[in-house]
Amino acid sequence: MLYSPLYQSIRLILFGALGLSSLTVSAAINQTDSMMPEPLVTDSSNQYADDESIQESLKRLAEFYERTPDTNVATSNNTGTNVSDEQSNIQNSLTPVTTNIPTVGSNLRLLPHTVDSAARCEGQWVYPKKNPNYQRAVNEAGASNGQPAPNLNGLPNNQAPLFAESDYGYYDNVDYAELSGNVIIDQGTQHIEAEKIVLDLSNGVAAAQGKVMFTDQATGNASATQTQDRVQKNGKTSLTDKAAQGGLIGVADNLNYNTETGQSTATNVAFASVELQAHGYAKRLNRPNESQYELDEVMYSTCPPTNRKWQFDAKSIDLDTETGRGEAYNTTFRIADVPVFYLPYFNFPIDSRRGSGFLLPNASISSENGLEVDVPYYFNLAPNYDATLSTHIYTTRNPMLSGEFRYLTENYGEGIFNGSYLPNDKEYDGEDRRSLFYDHYWSSTSIPRLSGEAKYSHVSDADYLNDFDTLGLSDNTLNLARRAQLNYYNDYVDGELKVETFQTLDALNNNGQMLQDKDKPYSRLPQLNLDYRLPWAKNFDITGVSDSAYFKKSIDDGSENEKSGTRFYNKLSASYPMENSWGYIKPKLSLQHLFTSYDKDSLVDNSLDKDDGNQSVFVPQASIDAGLHFYQAGSPFGAFDDTLGGYRLLSPRLKYTYSPFKDQNNIPNFNTRIASINYEQLFSDSWFLGHDRLQDLHAFTPGINYRYIDATGVTRFDGSIAEQFYIDDGGVTLDNTKPVFTSSSSGLVWDTSTQPYNNVWVDVSGALTNSYDLNYITTELRYQPSDNSLFNVGFIKRQRDENTNQLPLSALTASAVFPINNNWRVLAQGQYDYNRNQMLDSLIGIDYEDCCFGFAVYGRRYYNDLNIADKPTQAIMAEVRLSGLGSGSSRLTRLLADKVLGFEPVQSAWKD
């Protein structure tokens, strides 16, 4: 929320007014010389201070901005217990004493660990020194009463002892007290300084006058539970958590408070948030009652006070804690003191409650869309539903209107609509562009484990997802799902019932031709899937699979005859697993049944009678899966370096499978395909993905896995190799084509993962054909020299496979995220197809980050995944981020998270 730090500062200012009432209960005064009271100034309508006065307040506030880049903001200038000590004490109380395992292995040092250790900011806001007299007075008070001194760490401020000191003091033992000359008041983590503090309960007036300074450290506002949560999250807290915990410093000329009405007024207030590293001022602050606040001439920025690159200025701000809303009037956003945009009125939240109003605008620049400005408006329609309406303004397109509607019901679930409309797009031959996405989720309140979901997706054209950063979908998708689904599970059954259709976008098939109706997926109208197990036999595992559906695909372009109908598939299996620490053996028997029936339209189109349109087939299957485990302690590199320790595990495996041949050439294929080859697939019961074919498979598969795990539990090497050998040729085909499995073996398959250094990972997988030519190989090398840098290099080469519709590809992939110094970094990623001599996707950019703001400029050139023959899209994008405002997620970070392996932890380290 934009002005929540302002609201937090007001709360702290009022501590100075509200906390003064406790002076009537306890006060420790250095000198008790009696003195006559001076007239008390209570008029809150004095002439506003001039600009020099507010500048004086800012100068006083700047005393707490320390120019030491290595300073810990939570502990600077503190002589008492700090945040780290508090977290350590809590962590020690929560965690049992353990023996630390030293780190083993080493890091690869090809690049410097850090390029530039200079801080991003020239300084930071720090708390003032703790008053040493406070703890001393607390200790002495406890000793005089024969009681131990209270532990102030974690003690709520309203329960902590109050201590006051000054040069002069007066108290009439009834209802009047006055302190003057270097007045200091401490209670817990709250601290006030002033030239004079007066309390007159008879007139209901309290006042702090002359160079008022107040602070409330965040550690004092965090409860024990909050602090414990912070420790368990490695000390990281969200922006909202930080704002709620306080951690503020404020200075003012004076503060007046009416103890009867609750009205208070302060002038020339300057404040800083240590937790948020933000600061600002208000020329005048007035609190007419306990729930309303009025500020005049307000400024807020997260930049250093010595170099304020941006700031928000408002003529006035009104806050209401009852409604949870604030109103800003005549607000101007400035960059380098130059006005950038102006809002005459702005309504915003000051707590977690929702309310209607404008949200923070977004802006970006690209060569395709030009300048894009998004202005969202939020509608708080009811506690259980709301809406957001956004206007997108482009310099190269007509404006787009998009909306989001969210709802939550007590018994019928929750959902969200997203839609957009752009009329007469100048960049798309004047066509209208539109989209609609809907998602609904439901869980039964009366039947446990019963849930449901619904999904709808629609776009106007195949390029829509490519042109716009769409809510609901981030990548190009050929088939957009539309479905309604029910799910249920318990200890014995896991089932789903769904109806599903698709919107298929215009695209090219594998032959470079436009997709035809025959290439589109079947609709399921409906489909019922059940996975179940029967608890009849104690030592046997009896399981079953049932898949029943009506498949429909309309053929309107004459690309083939329509083949729609019903399919019923059932499989019942019984196994007797025998397992031990040294190995296992799992024999299994299965019986499969497949029944299909064409519908009336398909019978006519294919000139079939009803009997020919019905097909039924039974196929039994038997298999034995066995493996051994050989364990040996120590490192395989012990002859060279035995410091890694750990153990090695060698696991050979052998599986035998037999299922006979049954002719299935007259059975339609609704949604079945042949699986791609990989290590795990070699040990499955079938090569068909789907239930339109029951494979005849007579084969045995030997394989072996070797793993090395070091002393800290890190898997340094995990490698597997296997090959499937066929005793009989396979005769079942998908679509009356030649048999697929007629060779002697599948070819050799391997899969390895290695971590030779603590910051280097290497993955290699591949397969050979049965003649031991290359089928495919993929490699991925990841090097992370530091927490905020990353380098990836990958290679993939695969041959054409007509059985799986695998296209040939020879491509290199590379990505890099590395800092130039502590403020600048380079971002790059690319995918190059050297068979086509074509860069399929490339991005390069620079990113800047400091304590005040950040920006990125990057260029991207890429092809539409749905039509690689089209010309590539080229875009130059720019984005600006303001520290402390917005979610921190941008189009660039979302794109890189999808394209760059391991980007998200690197991004978190860079932001921290």
Curated annotation (Swiss-Prot):
<dbReference type="GO" id="GO:0009279">
    <property type="term" value="C:cell outer membrane"/>
</dbReference>
<dbReference type="GO" id="GO:0043165">
    <property type="term" value="P:Gram-negative-bacterium-type cell outer membrane assembly"/>
</dbReference>
<comment type="function">
    <text>Together with LptE, is involved in the assembly of lipopolysaccharide (LPS) at the surface of the outer membrane.</text>
</comment>
<comment type="similarity">
    <text>Belongs to the LptD family.</text>
</comment>
<keyword id="KW-0472">Membrane</keyword>
<dbReference type="Pfam" id="PF04453">
    <property type="entry name" value="LptD"/>
</dbReference>
<feature type="signal peptide">
    <location>
        <begin position="1"/>
        <end position="27"/>
    </location>
</feature>
<comment type="subunit">
    <text>Component of the lipopolysaccharide transport and assembly complex. Interacts with LptE and LptA.</text>
</comment>
<keyword id="KW-0732">Signal</keyword>
<dbReference type="InterPro" id="IPR020889">
    <property type="entry name" value="LipoPS_assembly_LptD"/>
</dbReference>
<dbReference type="GO" id="GO:1990351">
    <property type="term" value="C:transporter complex"/>
</dbReference>
<dbReference type="GO" id="GO:0015920">
    <property type="term" value="P:lipopolysaccharide transport"/>
</dbReference>
<protein>
    <recommendedName>
        <fullName>LPS-assembly protein LptD</fullName>
    </recommendedName>
</protein>
<dbReference type="InterPro" id="IPR050218">
    <property type="entry name" value="LptD"/>
</dbReference>
<dbReference type="InterPro" id="IPR007543">
    <property type="entry name" value="LptD_C"/>
</dbReference>
<keyword id="KW-0998">Cell outer membrane</keyword>
